[in-house]
UniProtKB/Swiss-Prot annotation:
Record text on subunit structure and interactions: Interacts with TRX1 and major capisd protein/MCP.
Full protein name: Triplex capsid protein 2
Top-level taxon of origin: Viruses
Lineage: Viruses, Duplodnaviria, Heunggongvirae, Peploviricota, Herviviricetes
Known role: Structural component of the T=16 icosahedral capsid. The capsid is composed of pentamers and hexamers of major capsid protein/MCP, which are linked together by heterotrimers called triplexes. These triplexes are formed by a single molecule of triplex protein 1/TRX1 and two copies of triplex protein 2/TRX2. Additionally, TRX1 is required for efficient transport of TRX2 to the nucleus, which is the site of capsid assembly.
The keyword DNA damage belongs to this UniProt entry's keyword annotation: no
Pfam families associated with the record: Herpes_V23 (PF01802)
Annotated Gene Ontology cellular component terms: host cell nucleus; viral capsid
Record keywords, A-Z: Capsid protein, Host nucleus, Virion
Encoding gene, per UniProt annotation: TRX2
Length: 318
């Protein structure tokens, strides 16, 4: 456990009942999303009701978009009057680890990058209802990042299908609701009903894909002559060029002339600047469909596999 780190105190109202206080005691290791990083916060600031906008409760994709605007924090202690949470972005910059409860239906392995997604699995409830305070705590599910990306991609596909339904295949597609991970069969029951979040995800996805495809094709057409010149000396480049690629064959047949760019005293040929920008942009394309990893599992002397329900020591993802 880390020491001497930034901690946020979430005040528990005095009117809480004993059963609700006991329910909060079992929330150690869960993750809450802070609207701002401050020393003092109210419990209502991290409750599910704080995500409601315009009187409408967000669905699964809406929660994902809201997660990106907030700061994840791991609950380290639950005291009678306050909850102590350690913000991942700030508190874990010091040396050490914090314990994260594995509430997912799959195991977390040492070294796994972990992403946080809303509850999406059948038969799984992560809500803690505090009747005396009229508040609900809906905790995210920590998942290995590859699994989280596949789940969110399926959710976006479901939303796109609802946005533009196919009359030939009415109803839901069962293949979108079932996936397999490490031999386990997982069923999705996520709520995707509001089209605003689907439109936001779809717009970002399409714009990024169009940019990446257009700029990437331009870079390939520009680099093909140089790759052909290197193919006689580099075996890897030669094998790469021997691949039956439509883009490669089209570039060899068409071989368009590179546009003559205006040069001035402070500007070089922007090919490599464009390549760097495209690589950075392509790397961000995956983050559009899922949250970036928040933490990484790091077990020192314990078991390398953390089962569902157990505590997993985690460090801040680099």
């Amino acid at each position: 456990m880390i020491t001497d780190c930034f901690e946020a105190d979430i005040a528990i109202p005095s009117g809480i009942s004993r059963p609700d206080a006991a329910a909060l005691q079992r929330c150690e290791g869960r993750v809450v999303f802070l609207p701002t990083i401050r020393r003092q916060l109210a419990l209502a600031d991290v409750a599910h009701e704080s995500f409601v906008s315009g009187g409408v409760s967000p669905d699964t994709l809406g929660l994902l978009l809201a997660y990106r605007r907030r700061f994840p924090a791991v609950i380290t202690r639950v005291l009678p009057t306050r909850i102590v949470a350690c913000p991942v972005d700030l508190g874990l910059t010091h040396a050490g680890t914090v314990n994260l409860r594995n509430t997912s239906p799959v195991d977390l392995c040492n070294g796994d990058p972990v992403s946080l997604v809303p509850p999406v699995f059948e038969g799984q409830a992560t809500d803690v209802r505090l009747e005396s305070l009229d508040l609900t705590l809906r905790f995210p599910v920590p998942l290995p990042t590859p699994l989280a990306r596949e789940i969110v991609a399926r959710l976006v596909a479901r939303g796109i299908r609802d946005l533009n339904p196919d009359p030939r295949t009415p109803g839901e597609l069962p293949d979108l609701n079932v996936l397999y991970y490490n031999g386990a069969r997982l069923s999705l029951v996520a709520d995707v009903q509001q089209l605003a979040s689907v439109n936001t995800e779809l717009r970002s996805l399409v714009l990024n894909m169009v940019y990446s495809i257009t700029e990437g094709t331009t870079l390939i057409l520009t680099l093909i002559p140089r790759l052909l010149a290197l193919s006689a000396q580099d075996g890897y480049v030669n094998a790469l060029l021997q691949m039956q690629s439509v883009t490669r064959e089209a570039a060899q047949l068409i071989h368009p002339e590179a546009p003559m760019l205006m040069q001035d005293g402070e500007r070089r040929l922007p090919l490599y600047e464009a390549l760097v920008a495209w690589l950075a942009h392509a790397g961000q394309l995956g983050d559009i469909l899922a949250l970036a990893p928040a933490v990484r599992v790091c077990t020192f002397d314990g078991a390398a596999v953390v089962q569902s329900g157990d505590m997993a020591p985690v460090i801040r993802y680099p």
